[in-house]
């Protein structure tokens, strides 16, 4: 099974991605986690990523594409994967399509978590304070929300046109969101998609 999870910063993608990955026994691949892990590295690429993330902008397509493509070739992705934080732009959609086509794979479903913008700001400020995440400052949050609206939101239209978009209300308790998410995926599976349940 090949899944994407999308939504604005603070929508709870990471939390839900872990639950989805466990349920379907596939790896959850987060570009954000991969890039944050580069903070402790002293390479030119790591320094570039650190500066970009501190400003609230996204890492350039070419760098992100290379990291994701290499990760999707790993053995644990043979049964499928859940991508969190990729693709973010239309060129990345095209790149991912090409990578998947080479392996005769396709996206089965794109999960979109919808959350009120005011709720998102509160979530991110709380997360930044408790987790010590430097990229969760008010300025960076505003920048990421604008970038999401300008660049990432149009991807939902692409996946909606392809018939693979599964929209889920991301407001509320984590367990309630998870329940809605699996109900939506089960409904999609019942409509003849390629989704197959896990544990």
Predicted segments with their positions:
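Glycine-rich phosphate-binding loop of ATP-dependent small-molecule kinases
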Residues: 1-199
């Amino acid at each position: 099974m090949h899944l994407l999870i999308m939504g604005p910063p603070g929508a709870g993608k990471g939390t839900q991605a872990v639950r989805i990955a466990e349920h379907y026994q596939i790896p959850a691949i987060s570009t954000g986690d991969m890039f944050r892990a580069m903070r402790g590295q002293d390479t030119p690429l790591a320094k570039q990523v650190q500066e970009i993330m501190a400003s609230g902008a996204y890492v350039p397509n070419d760098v992100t594409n290379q990291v994701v493509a290499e990760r999707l070739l790993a053995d644990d992705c043979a049964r499928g994967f859940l991508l969190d934080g990729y693709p973010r732009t239309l060129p990345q959609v095209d790149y991912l399509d090409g990578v998947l086509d080479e392996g005769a794979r396709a996206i089965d479903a794109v999960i979109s978590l919808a959350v009120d913008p005011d709720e998102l700001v509160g979530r991110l400020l709380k997360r930044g304070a408790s987790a010590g995440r430097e990229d969760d400052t008010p300025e960076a949050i505003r920048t990421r929300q604008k970038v999401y609206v300008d660049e990432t939101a149009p991807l939902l239209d692409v996946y909606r046109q392809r018939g693979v978009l599964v929209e889920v209300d991301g407001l509320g308790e984590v367990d309630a969101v998870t329940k809605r998410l699996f109900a939506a995926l089960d409904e999609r599976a019942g409509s003849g998609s390629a989704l197959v349940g896990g544990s």
